[in-house]
């Protein structure tokens, strides 16, 4: 095999892998908020993105942030309130207040439905 063939094959595999990775994650604009809006009237894309940002910024400080659909709604409702004080302690400030906690829980619900 020639060096050119190996190089071309490697580039092709890399490009296909990148395209597959980009297409596999839900983008924020592709999220369907219908279920969350039925459960939480007035829930908006702004609420979703705020909850998502709080989750991403705080819930991976001490451990990997879990996928929203990795736990049930009841499990999240049990664990998030227990984890918020630890996340705040790790941040050295109140990074997540009560309303932030609610936005995180609603984000997890919306992202898993």
Label the model's feature ranges.
Residues 94-113:
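C-terminal capping alpha-helices of c-type cytochrome domains
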Residues 18-21:
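C-terminal motif of bacterial Sec signal peptides marking the signal peptidase cleavage site
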Residues 55-65, 104:
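The canonical Cys-X-X-Cys-His
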Residues 25-53:
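Electrostatic cytochrome c docking/interface patches
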Residues 14, 54:
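Flanking scaffold residues of small Cys/His-coordinated metal-binding clusters
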